[in-house]
Amino acid sequence: MELMNLSCEGFLEELASKAAAPGGGGASALVGAAGVALGSMVGSLTVGKKKYAAVEADIVALNVRAEALRKRLEALVQADAEAFLPVAAAYKLPKETPEQQAHKAAVLEKALDRACAVPLEVMTACGEGIALAAEYAEKGSVLARSDAGCAALFCKAAMQAAGLNVKVNTRLMADKAHADALEARAEQLLAEFVPQADMVYQSVSNE
């Protein structure tokens, strides 16, 4: 099932169902994509306005980056669902013999690593979305500054939620050093971009 081909209602019905995917990871990617789309909205409302002629080239460049970023996050909605399937399959492998147990452990470890990789990609993309939102808030139409603030908040929430999906998988890993490295990367992204998102929100809300 191609999740991005579903209607909004169809996606939400799948999300609300007992199906294992989509779940928090896919929803995070979708929320991030919505945040980036809000940034693009600011750009669309700015381009062509005489008042913003001095920054038009900058806004056009932002719009190109934002469109590519939104497409990346849309693809990650599907990628997250597909990354979960091997984890679920690994748990169903037999473990009657030592050989089966070793095989199951190896397959599960590999699947968990991939299940961490996708939400880390979502986090990275959302960080880029927050940076874009900051530029849209600074240079875009004042009539749409609240949308730039919403863009930053959406991407922040999506990043934090994706971070939870990293942790839920690293906690199951046998290779604790690798798990710690993945968690450290997630924490680094949060430390870098959450304050930036908060600054965008404050600058918009205090106007």
For each feature predicted by the language model, list its residue ranges.
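A structural-propensity feature for long, helix-poor, extended segments
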Residues: K50-A89, L189
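Preference for long, well-ordered alpha-helical segments
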Residues: G129-L132, A144-S203, E207
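Amphipathic alpha-helical interface segments
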Residues: D80, F84-L153, A157
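Short, hydrophobic/aliphatic alpha-helical segments
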Residues: L3-P22
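Conserved phosphate/anionic-ligand binding catalytic regions in large, soluble enzymes, centered on
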Residues: S17-S40, A144-A162
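Transmembrane signal-anchor/signal-peptide helices with a preference for the extracytoplasmic
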Residues: M41-A53
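Amphipathic, well-ordered alpha-helical segments in soluble domains
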Residues: S7, F11, A34-M41, A83, ...
